UniProtKB/Swiss-Prot annotation:
Location in the cell: Cell inner membrane
Topology in membrane: Single-pass membrane protein
Stretches of the chain found on the membrane's Cytoplasmic side: 1-4
Residues on Periplasmic side: 26-185
Gene designation: dsbE1
PROSITE patterns: THIOREDOXIN_1, THIOREDOXIN_2
Name of this chain's protein: Thiol:disulfide interchange protein DsbE
Any one Gene Ontology cellular component term annotated for this protein: plasma membrane
Task performed by this protein: Involved in disulfide bond formation. Catalyzes a late, reductive step in the assembly of periplasmic c-type cytochromes, probably the reduction of disulfide bonds of the apocytochrome c to allow covalent linkage with the heme. Possible subunit of a heme lyase.
Record-annotated membrane-spanning stretches: 5-25
Length: 185
């Protein structure tokens, strides 16, 4: 009996190690744990009425995302360290003419406005989702997340995690180019 009790920690360790190795093998075969499928892919952006982050009292609806050209909807917050890491790249994309709309998620308005002044504002428009309701409707797990929305307001892609050059070039840019061409026709 004592021998079995002594082997229990070893058995638990081996089970944890096996689970870890199994997940690492899946990742090596291309199973990306950050690739979270969205139930909204292929569907219109949910209806919303949100206040401008920078202009209190000015409200926008989903139509602001359906202006005939694709747009990136970037979910961010000042409490999110990864959002800070991706922010410089968003500034670069914006400078290249990529239209990015910011969705400030469950955040303090004054802190968010100060953050944009300090780090630069890549957003053509900043929306305040202080209660997180649009985030909930979009199925947001946390910040940052980025949605590619085509010119008709259809969600075409969702990326959970920071948007960086690798993600842009391999995942989003091909789709951006495709939907930009479609919008130009």
């Amino acid at each position: 009996m004592k021998r079995n009790v002594l082997l229990l920690p070893l058995l638990i360790f081996l089970l944890i190690a096996a689970a870890l190795l199994w997940q690492l093998a899946r990742n090596a075969q291309g199973d990306d744990p950050t690739n979270l499928e969205s139930a909204l892919t292929g569907k219109p952006v949910p209806a919303f009425r949100l206040e401008s982050l920078e202009t209190p009292g000015q409200y926008y609806q989903a139509e602001v995302l359906t202006q005939g050209k694709p747009v990136l909807l970037n979910v961010w917050a000042t409490w999110c360290p990864t959002c800070r890491a991706e922010h410089q790249y968003l500034n670069q994309l914006s400078a290249q003419g990529i239209r990015v709309v910011g969705l400030n998620y469950k955040d303090d308005r004054a802190k968010a406005v100060a953050w944009l002044k300090e780090l630069g504002n890549p957003y053509a428009l900043s929306l305040s989702d202080s209660d997180g309701m649009l985030g909930l409707d979009l199925g947001v797990y946390g910040a940052p997340e980025t949605f590619l929305i085509d010119g008709r307001g259809i969600i075409r892609y969702r990326h959970a995690g920071d948007l960086n050059a690798r993600v842009w070039e391999s995942e989003l840019k091909p789709l951006w180019d495709r939907y930009s061409r479609e919008a130009a026709q």
